[in-house]
């Protein structure tokens, strides 16, 4: 079994519990939804946030989007968070945070009891043995059926070709009508134990740019997200950078209150870091998420792009993040995607719209990892088909 060990010490809660201790400590809150055929669904919706996050966000394959904070954040947008531990033979094999909403809102009628389910970047596997994965997927099927879900959509971020998508097909899941995530191809840097070993992974010009930024006097800063006063001012400044960058480069930026609330929630949970770099000030910044053994690039912003090209501040920022992540105990740094729905796959020449972004990430030692599509499961085939058709023509 691949147990749910804490991925790294610095971000973990002060009191770390084993799986058995966690389940025992919260026995009074547990509701057994199904115990047939050796499978048990433990309702963990009311668990305290640190206990849930130790499994869902900080275990080896954990993900920040499966955290307690992320589920509660979506409550304000009309979703109801549901959290479950799936056990097989009294052994936890997976956890999942599901966002649920009514199919028809407040309207009644024959379809009034039906719901829509989405598990962002879930489920989180605690055991990757084939029989454990099958049990985890069966648990998801039963949750969807019992909660009258028309469809359950999952996008767990499993690597394409890993064999896990075969288990999905065998469990009655099918490729979703549309992907949830903008990009399926990420660039991941394998973190090394020493600076010398990490530098060997850099492209020649990248090492030069890092040295140039250092010589010019560019400085980097990591914000203490536990310090409320410093955090709020820094997040507000970062939002201004992020919004300005969105206008320059043409990507969508959510409204200030929503973005600040999601960043704040993840920061308070110890699942996000905010960094800045600049020459005589804060010129560029990056927000990063703690997802199991990976540090994940989530959002970025900068002031004048031309000045950044001159100072190479972003090169030094990425390098300092990489070194900090390696020293903290992360196994890899996910630098983010390099493809889109309209231009899928690893860029192979300059005709790809994200070719330059791909080169930038590759020069830090990033290697492409293609993740599977989103998958759907419909307990009722007829309703599921109707839902797919309705979404296709929306």
Predicted segments, located by residue:
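A conserved beta-strand-loop-helix scaffold within acyl/acetyltransferase catalytic domains
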Residues: 33, 38-89, 93-107, 156-161, ...
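Active-site/acyl-donor-binding loops of N-acyltransferases
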Residues: 2-38, 45-46, 99-100, 171-196, ...
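Residues at the N-termini of beta-strands
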Residues: 116, 149-151, 294, 332
């Amino acid at each position: 079994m691949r147990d749910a060990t804490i991925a790294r010490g610095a971000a973990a809660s002060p009191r770390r519990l084993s799986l058995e201790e966690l389940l025992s400590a919260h026995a009074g809150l547990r509701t057994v939804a199904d115990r047939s055929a050796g499978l048990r669904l433990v309702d963990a919706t009311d668990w305290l946030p640190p206990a849930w996050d130790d499994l869902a966000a900080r275990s080896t394959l954990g993900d920040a989007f499966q955290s307690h904070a992320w589920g509660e954040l979506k409550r304000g947008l009309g979703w109801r968070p549901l959290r479950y531990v799936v056990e097989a033979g009294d052994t936890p094999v997976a956890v999942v945070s599901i966002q649920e909403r009514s199919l028809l809102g407040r309207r009644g009628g024959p379809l009034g009891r039906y719901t829509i389910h989405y598990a962002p970047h879930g489920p989180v596997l605690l055991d990757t043995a084939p029989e454990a994965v099958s049990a985890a997927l069966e648990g998801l099927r039963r949750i969807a059926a019992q909660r009258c879900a028309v469809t359950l959509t999952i996008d767990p971020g499993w690597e394409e070709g890993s064999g896990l998508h075969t288990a999905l097909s065998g469990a009655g899941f099918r490729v979703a009508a549309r992907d949830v995530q903008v990009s399926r191809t990420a660039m991941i840097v394998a973190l090394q134990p020493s600076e010398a070993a990490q530098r060997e992974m850099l492209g020649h010009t990248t090492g030069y740019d890092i040295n140039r930024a250092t010589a010019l006097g560019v400085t980097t800063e990591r914000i203490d997200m536990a310090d409320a006063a410093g955090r709020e001012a820094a997040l507000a400044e970062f939002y201004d950078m992020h919004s300005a960058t969105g206008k320059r480069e043409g990507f969508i930026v959510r409204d200030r209150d929503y973005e600040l609330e999601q960043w704040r929630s993840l920061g308070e949970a110890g699942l996000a870091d905010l960094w800045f770099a600049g020459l005589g000030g804060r010129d560029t910044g990056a927000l990063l998420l703690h997802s199991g053994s990976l540090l994940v690039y989530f959002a970025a912003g900068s002031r004048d792009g031309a000045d950044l090209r001159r100072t190479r501040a972003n090169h030094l920022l990425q390098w300092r993040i990489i070194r900090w992540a390696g020293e903290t105990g992360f196994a890899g740094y996910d630098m983010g995607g390099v493809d889109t729905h309209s231009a899928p796959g690893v860029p192979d020449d300059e005709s790809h719209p994200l070719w330059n972004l791909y080169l930038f990430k590759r020069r830090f030692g990033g290697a492409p990892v293609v993740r599977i599509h989103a998958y759907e499961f419909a307990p009722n085939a007829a309703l599921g088909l109707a839902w797919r058709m309705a979404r296709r023509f929306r």
